Amino acid sequence: VADMLVARGVVSREELAGRADPAPSPLAEKALKAPQVAGVLARGGPADRPSDIAAIFAPGDAVVTRKQPENTIVPGGHTRLPAYAAGAKGRVLRLHGTHVLPDSNAHDLGEAPEPLYAVAFPASELWAHPEHPRDEVVLDLWQSYLEAP
């Protein structure tokens, strides 16, 4: 994280080492006041983008997540596919449109937008002995995480 902050100019190596008197950061002007935080978080960050990748699933479709919950672009890299949902069967609730793929974007490899779906999984599909077997867990998952059963 420190290397990323230095590379992006947020802090210097001297500041991290405690040897420099930090100059006022241009980010300080963007700092939210306490009353603003809830409203900003409720709006979220805009991550929807245009994409040439067509949605291949529709609401009601059965899907299965990839068996390996790993980043297929960067070995050992960031992914939003939870390990507990790897290989699980679910159904598409809705298509959110196309959004930035974190597996690529988190590693400065571009936004690589692709379709993002809300997928419902029965609790019994995710855990061997769920407290309430008829409960559902809904995950927002990118198209590259999903396959047809």
Where are the model-predicted features located?
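N-terminal intrinsically disordered, low-complexity, charge/repeat-rich segments that act as generic
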Residues: 1-26
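Solvent-exposed, flexible loop/coil residues
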Residues: 15, 20, 45, 88-89
